[in-house]
Amino acid sequence: PLNHSISLKGINGKDLQILIAEDNDSNYSLVKHILKEYQITRVVNGVEAVEKVRDEEFDIVLMDMKMPIMGGLEATRKIRELNPIIPIIALTANAFDADRVSAMEAGCNAFLTKPLKKEELLELFSFKL
C-alpha cells in the first residue's frame, strides 16, 4: 500500500488548519481519520461554515455539498465573498459532471466523490497547498 506522509504547514508555519463542513458523522469520522495529523474544526451546515471562515483563519475547507440549513454550493459562494483565495474542496456523493461544474462555478477548487479515498484527498492537499 502507498504510504503518504505529508508535512504541510499552514498560516505562519503553524499546523494546517482545516475546516470540515460535513453533517454526516460517518463521513466526518473518515475524513478526520485521514487527516488526523492536522488541526480540524467541524461544522455541520453551510451557515456555520461561513461564520467560521469569517471569524477564524483556515488553510483549507472541505465542503459537503448536501447539508441542512445551507448547502455547500451557497456556502462556497458566500465564503468566496469573504475569502477569494482559500482552497475549497467539494465533497459529494454525486459524481455527475453537472455536479462537478456546479461546484466549480460556485468557487470550489477541486471536487471529490464519497466515499473518500485517502490517496485522492492527500494528493489534492499536496497540489493545493
Q: What are these language model-derived features?
A:
Residues P1-L19:
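Disordered, acidic interdomain junction associated with two-component signaling
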Residues P68, F96:
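The feature encodes the CheY-like receiver
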Residues R42-I60, E81:
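Acidic, metal-coordinating helix/loop segments flanking the phosphotransfer/catalytic sites
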